[in-house]
């Protein structure tokens, strides 16, 4: 799918490749269950392969092999790389979430637990990630709220709940959500700028 998007949406790869900004893609190692943070320009493979791995959904995607290791979506082990950024010593951290403030994930039902077990029983460390991801996400959201209230980080979140699923196929609904995100993102610019300048 990523290759299809690259054909349809113009992207200035030259500027991206040679720009001075550090860019990372987070993917989960299916063998170890641990997140890997791939930095643009510092891998032995094309960075877009790391991006592809970081967006490869479990259950729906074949793992992407990087340096001989299988990887899936970074969110399986690291929903938001907040603690990584704090540990790296970043002084200013802007977090953009896909859910509104106060959103918390429900724990998976038995059918989902069984499905994860069917797919990943031979990968016990990754399976453990899948079975605890909601709990880790919710704990991280509590931490985000605290750090935001203390002014340590800046969060940009949807103003209203997202009402479509991750496999939505209705192009009109997707376009409406895109336009909403674009509008709300522009509205948040003053907030972000103010945070970065303090």
Indicate residue ranges for each PLM-predicted region.
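Patatin-like phospholipase
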Residues: 1-198
């Amino acid at each position: 799918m990523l290759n299809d998007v690259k054909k349809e949406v113009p992207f200035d790869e030259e500027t991206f490749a040679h720009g001075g900004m550090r860019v990372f893609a987070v993917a989960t190692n299916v063998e170890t269950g641990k997140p890997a943070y791939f930095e643009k320009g510092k891998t032995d493979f094309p960075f877009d392969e790391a991006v592809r791995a970081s967006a490869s959904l479990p259950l729906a995607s074949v793992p992407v092999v990087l340096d001989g290791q299988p990887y899936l979506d970074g969110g399986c082990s690291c929903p938001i790389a907040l603690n990584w950024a704090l540990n790296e010593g970043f002084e200013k951290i802007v977090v953009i979430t896909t859910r509104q403030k106060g959103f918390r994930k429900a724990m998976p039902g038995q059918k989902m637990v069984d499905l994860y077990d069917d797919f990943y029983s031979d990968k016990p460390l990754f399976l453990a990630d899948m079975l605890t991801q909601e709990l880790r996400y919710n704990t991280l959201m509590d931490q985000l709220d605290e750090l935001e209230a203390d002014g340590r980080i800046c969060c940009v979140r949807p103003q209203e709940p997202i009402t479509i699923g991750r496999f939505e196929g209705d192009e009109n609904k997707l376009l409406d959500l895109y336009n909403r995100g674009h509008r709300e993102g522009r509205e948040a610019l003053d907030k972000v700028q103010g945070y970065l300048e303090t």
